[in-house]
Amino acid sequence: MRKVLAIETSCDETSVSIVSNIGNTFKIHSNIIASQIEDHSKWGGVVPELAARKHLELLPFVLEKALTESKIKIEEVDYIASTVAPGLVGCLRVGSITARSLCMLHSKPFLGIHHLEGHLSSILFSENYPKKSFLTLLVSGGHTELIKVDDRRGMQRLGKSFDDAAGEAFDKVGRLLGLSYPGGPAIEKIAKNGDPMKFNLPKCRISDKKGGFLKYDFSFSGLKTAVLRLVEKINLDGKTVPVPDIAASFERVVAEVLVERTIRCAEDHSLDNVVVVGGVAANNTLRKMMISEANKKSIKVHLAPLNLCTDNAAMIGAAALFRIKFKDHLSSLKLGVSGRLSIEQANTLYEENPPF
């Protein structure tokens, strides 16, 4: 049994987890998450400097709690991993420096993990996760991407958002509607009392320079602007803004766009397994719609466990375990962090000469 201590500090969650695997079975021994939502809610979004300082404050306590809850001593851990890209650089440094320091203190090998690969790996804690090639919809506050994953974890991005990520659009529309931060859960909650067909909001597409539209790519900036114009018009007319109806209509359109393009991409690439991960993957409307539409096409849907949709260290540990199992990858202790790194460049994190 391989055991990994993993650290995640790429944005506004401070998380430490102890995970292990035996063959194809992955187990979480502890997964402690300290959220900073209350610290950032008054600003309507994450303040990078504040987030980094909070990680410095919280990480020692989160680390101690993760070890205590797992009943595993750090000397018994086989590997130590941390998120190194992409993310907020100051936040990434806190986790990475801590992880590499622990590696030096306890003579443990280090793995730097790509944050998006971590999200992809959250599905490993689900029953009957796909063992062959599959399509992943990764949909979160910072990313909306369609990624093909082969049976050896080779990754190819097939679609992306050209502006706002879906989760970012939820936050911005939530703010427009006067809802609390983060916008995703707030919109989902109030949308339950609204009519999702009340407003005909646009499904924005990206033009292809060769003609037509890019079939697998996303754009949510125009949808956000449409909601803004709608709210402005209602206010100018002197009427009460029907927040539940707007929230429900917005939520429906986002889910429809995500589902339609995911199913189209899966069909075009002959992939009969779709994985949905990331913070927005917790949205119930999206989950139900994806399953319903995929069933019509004989495509099986694998949903990330609800408690592992948002940022957490267990998914980082799972990514590390998978790397060790199939590719025997280790990172240099000289590896730094980066705010940007495409998923196709994840293998560079294990080169003898680090990319940063």
From Swiss-Prot:
Gene3D superfamilies with a match to the protein in the record: 3.30.420.40
Coiled coil feature spans: none
Record: residues binding Fe cation: 115, 119, 311
Alphabetical list of PANTHER family matching this protein: TRNA N6-ADENOSINE THREONYLCARBAMOYLTRANSFERASE, TRNA N6-ADENOSINE THREONYLCARBAMOYLTRANSFERASE, MITOCHONDRIAL
Family: Belongs to the KAE1 / TsaD family.
Residues the record lists as binding substrate: 138-142, 171, 184, 283
Cofactor: Fe(2+)
Compartmental location: Cytoplasm
Native source organism of the sequence: Prochlorococcus marinus (strain MIT 9312)
Gene: tsaD
Cofactor mode of binding and number, as noted: Binds 1 Fe(2+) ion per subunit.
Organism domain of life: Bacteria
One of the record's GO cellular component terms: cytoplasm
Taxonomic lineage from the root: Bacteria, Bacillati, Cyanobacteriota, Cyanophyceae, Synechococcales
GO MF terms, alphabetically ordered: iron ion binding; N(6)-L-threonylcarbamoyladenine synthase activity
Pfam families xrefs: TsaD
Protein name from the UniProt record: tRNA N6-adenosine threonylcarbamoyltransferase
